[in-house]
Amino acid sequence: YHDEFRVLGNGRGSFEGVTRGMELLRDGGVEFNVLVVVNRLTGDHPDQLYDYFLKSDLRYLQFVPCVEKDPDTGSITDWSVRPGQYGDFLCRLFDRWYNDGKPEISIRMFDNLVSMAVGQPAECCEMREHCDSYLVVEYNGDCYPCDFFVNDEWRLGNLMEKPLWDIAADPKTRKFALDKAVPQGECQSCRWLSICLQGCQRYRDQVPGRRDYICSALKRFFAHAAPRIATIAAGLNHQRQPDPAPPRTDPPKASRNAPCPCGSGRRYKHCCGRKAAQPTA
């Protein structure tokens, strides 16, 4: 599937080079994640993709839906994943990942859902209230709020012109960060708003009249996965519970002139009995 779209300048596929690069990273002890683009082709093969990654011992994955517009027509390209297809893909991928509550692979989206279910903030930017997780810095020093918005409209400045902290505090940067904070339209009453938080701005307004291109896919997936996410979260919460404190027991009673039960060899009235008789402040 990789070589269908990722072709080198000489017309050859790049899959062999990518796998060679991964082996070099492994040989050097460098940790890495795999970014997987879900397009019209790969969207039909979640099982084959999962099996390949598991067999290849690639355990840290991130799946990103391909949604591209044709610049000439404004319509969604033929190679983009379709909403229904993406929903099917996520549901089946989750079924494989779940593994009876003991996942063998880290998939970023699923891991974030578990984190949120145990009360931790999401790490994925699309699942956060504001789009301010990072800034993109290009080779020439140009800065942008997101790698999906590297364009003239959202150029925030250049590191050769002003320091990074000034760019991060710029009103334009803050505007982008806050654009998704207030629920709009049907999102206001959506049962999944607390998880989705209106999703990624990249997929908004791709099709006239539809706020988020992959909204229907996410709704279907959340409904499919929610019970098992809750099961994993409950197990993690149980593991985090501290061991109960041992029950408090009172010292055995003894007569005043008997040997003290603590084993000191002294009479009770001159040892623990005296302490017990002392008034407390």
Regions found by a protein language model. Give the residues of each.
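Extracellular repeat turn/loop positions enriched in glycine and acidic/polar residues, especially those
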Residues: 263-265
